Each structure stands twice: as structure tokens, then as C-alpha cells.
Amino acid sequence: QKPGEAVILEQSIDNDGLGQYTFGFKTSDGLIRQEQGVVKNQGTENEALEVRGTITWLGADGKDYSINFVADENGFQPQYTQ
């Protein structure tokens, strides 16, 4: 590992093959990503994928920062937390 490069410490992936999935990972530089997707209104004209997730990272100040998000038919909707 070179200075400034991160490696994946943990990783999980699950996909049911029908549009629903979960995945996540954690890296050596403190980045954590969790995400899940589900098909809403499946089989209708209003069918849409809804994705929810969280991205957390360690700031240069040593504090954790996070973005929780939803992405669906209404677009990408992030919420920042500290």
C-alpha cells in the first residue's frame, strides 16, 4: 500500500436478482459506505428503484462526517450530518 492509498477492509454484497440489493464496504482510511436498493411499485407503470444509503468518512480534523441519502423517482436527496 502506497501512502495516500486506501485498501478495502470489509465488503458485503447481496443481490436477489430481482432489483433488490444491499452492499457495503469499509476502507483503511475510514470511509464507510452502506447502500440498499428496492424496487417500489413493482410490475406497475409507476415502478421505480429506491436507493437508500450512508457514506461516512474521517475528516482531516479527526471527526466523522456522514451523508445519508435517498435516490428515487424524485431525484438524489442527500442529508449531511456531523
Curated annotation (Swiss-Prot):
One of its GO terms (molecular function) is structural constituent of chitin-based larval cuticle. Residues 18-82 form the Chitin-binding type R&R domain. The keyword Disulfide bond does not apply. The modification Pyrrolidone carboxylic acid is found at residue 1. The keyword Acyltransferase does not apply. One of its GO terms (cellular component) is chitin-based extracellular matrix. InterPro entries: CHIT_BIND_RR_consensus, Cuticle_Struct_Prot, Insect_cuticle. It comes from the Eukaryota. Keywords: Cuticle, Pyrrolidone carboxylic acid. Pfam families: Chitin_bind_4. Component of the abdominal endocuticle. PANTHER family: ADULT CUTICLE PROTEIN 65AA-RELATED (PTHR10380:SF218), CUTICLE PROTEIN (PTHR10380). This is Endocuticle structural protein SgAbd-6.
